[in-house]
Amino acid sequence: MFSEHLPSSSSQVFQEHFIDSFVSRKLLQQIPFAHNAQQAHVPDKNNLSGNVLMLLSILLCGIICSLGLHYIIRCAFIRSRSFMISDPISIPSTPRDSSVNKGIKKKALKMLPVVNYSPEINLPGVGEECVICLSDFVAGEQLRVLPKCNHGFHLRCIDKWLTQHMTCPKCRHCLVDTCQKVLSDCDAADQVAATATESIDIRISPLEPEARVATFRESS
């Protein structure tokens, strides 16, 4: 009986040993693959974090460069503006711009005609309202009438306008030639008046002393 059970037991032992060795080989074959898979995932994460860090660094450098460029441009603009304000002679300007910004002189402004408004006034360029302040004319108000175009405006409105402009606010007629003519006529009139004053020669004869007059009367 012992001899009959021996082959079966040895075969079982052989089978178990074969199965164990097969399983162990399978496990040994699978473990390196798992280890390699874990090692393969680690470089991917490292590469991702490196790319994100590089992108953030590039973005930060771009922001710093843009801020620096903006600061430089602003400093240059402020410096050029301060230079223009401190040295207005160096600013190129045309005669037309200078005349527009300067306005007319007060002496020529006072020579422009002034009328008292009334509803019955018969002037073609005078309407019913002032185009500067957009208020209606009231009877008795003083209006200044511009030459050539004959447009009328409130005295205070047009005087303030003409201190900064050389044109009519309604038709944009230029008043440069007119004002120059007014000033030249005014200067000529002043010169004539001064010449007439200088040419007047007043001679007053001296009076005789009272004592001589009394003596002459007594003797006569």
Curated annotation (Swiss-Prot):
SUPFAM superfamilies per the UniProt record, alphabetical: RING/U-box
ZnF region ranges: RING-type: 130-172
Spans traversing the lipid bilayer: 53-73
Pathway: Protein modification; protein ubiquitination
InterPro entries for the chain: ATL10/ATL72-79-like (IPR044602), Znf_RING (IPR001841), Znf_RING/FYVE/PHD (IPR013083)
Top-level taxonomic group: Eukaryota
Cell compartment(s), UniProt: Membrane
Alphabetical UniProt keywords: Membrane, Metal-binding, Transferase, Transmembrane, Transmembrane helix, Ubl conjugation pathway, Zinc, Zinc-finger
Name of the protein in its database record: RING-H2 finger protein ATL77
Organism: Arabidopsis thaliana (Mouse-ear cress)
Gene name, Swiss-Prot/TrEMBL: ATL77
